[in-house]
Amino acid sequence: MSDTIAAIATAPGQGGIAIVRVSGDMAEDILRRIFRPVGGKHPLPTHLLTYGYIVDGTERIDECMAVIMRAPKSYTREDVVEFQLHGGGCVAQKVLALCLSSGARLAQPGEFTRRAFLNGRIDLSQAEAVMDLIAAQGEQSRKAAMRQLTGGASSFIRKAADELYAIQAGVAACIDYPEEISEEEAASDLAPRIAHLAKTLADACDERAARLLQSGLRVALCGQPNVGKSSLLNALLGEEKAIVTAIPGTTRDLVEGTLMLSGSVIHLTDTAGLHDTDDPVERIGVDRARRALADADVVLLVLDMSRPLSAEDESLLRALHGRNGCIVLNKSDLPPVLTESDLQDAADGKPILTVSASVPDSLQPLKSYLASQAAVSDQLTLTQPRHIAAARRAVAALHQAEETLRSYSVDLAGVDLQQAQMALAEITGDEVEEKLLDEVFGRFCVGK
């Protein structure tokens, strides 16, 4: 990491400002070469914005603010310089070119954060949280990413690792001093601790919650043709996303939209009406609808309460058994024929909500239901699929160690415990291969 890197840190296109970031030993030399402070002189004070001009020889390139953050009190723990320029691709590209011609090289994706990790300012789980924070679409995801960035996952894993080290020390003592600690005594003392640690880690592995934070809740609206699915989708989204007509079978393909409720991201999919049809195009739509239902986290079965329950409706109700979802009685603004009491037996304990797509206030219970399905505990510790996979490997190794220890094979249990330790170290990056680092930081944008 002896070389100095530079990149544009803001999104391309026109904007209020553009930022060019430089990190490395030559950062201050580059600052001196291309920045002329107004009413001041070099060296600039650290961590203070200074007004001046970017220059190329005697030519003024832009009026800007510049700041130097001297090591180790910077994002990368190296000397870091940032130029805050007028927004626009031309200016930023010119300033970047000046930095490169002055001795820096173009940064790779995620290289600034990678240096923060390699220089010990953050661990790998915190580095990944930076990407999660950038990618967060909802308040719930932002909060989870911020907890991880401030060390939530790190402290949990390090506490688990400390307990594991203590258990390993007990195993080592039994192996080194068998005359003082028998294998039976070691098993009696250590096996319960291993089991407790395995449970603690397993309880933190909530794949569904982690996926909700990463991708949002997938909701599919299903039902027979002309029950108001498309109208309901439009009403929930607050826009005319799907075409609505009185003709059954208007929706033939999937129509998707995204809704934000209580800080959670919810992806809605309106599907073609589920029924038998000889129309080949409509049949394709029905097949796609069934696939969307299979992939959904929540299924909303929409029924028209202004008409009686049909045999096809009853078939859909039976298909909903065992799935996560609710029954939506639509068209409550019309004279009711079908009521909640008519569906109590067929509902299989699922919520029954009465709404009208044409009456916005009636949608609040449905929105509350969807928000509850998308909610994730504020106490969630592991939010990255990679972390959960590593923790599950640690749990499996701990279970094996417990079983081996209870068989009084202390030395073999030590091998299993070492496997668990390596899995935990993968999460924080204490033990990690270069290939994994390339994969993690390759997901970042250039300039971060």
Description of each model-found segment:
Residues 237, 272-273, 297, 304-305, ...:
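Short glycine-/small-residue-rich Rossmann-like dinucleotide-binding loops
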Residues 1-143, 147, 151, 162, ...:
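A glycine-rich (often HGG/GG-containing) alpha/beta subdomain
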Residues 23-24, 88, 248, 305-306, ...:
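Short beta->alpha junction loops/turns
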Residues 2-8, 12, 52, 139-260, ...:
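C-terminal-of-GTPase-core extension/linker across diverse P-loop GTPases
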Residues 105, 265-267, 351:
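Conserved beta-strand segments of alpha/beta enzyme cores
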Residues 268, 302, 328:
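Generic enzyme active-site microenvironment
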Residues 50-62, 66-70, 249-277, 295-298:
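Switch I (G2) and immediately adjacent beta-strands of P-loop GTPase domains
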Residues 282-306:
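Inter-motif core of Ras-like GTPase G domains
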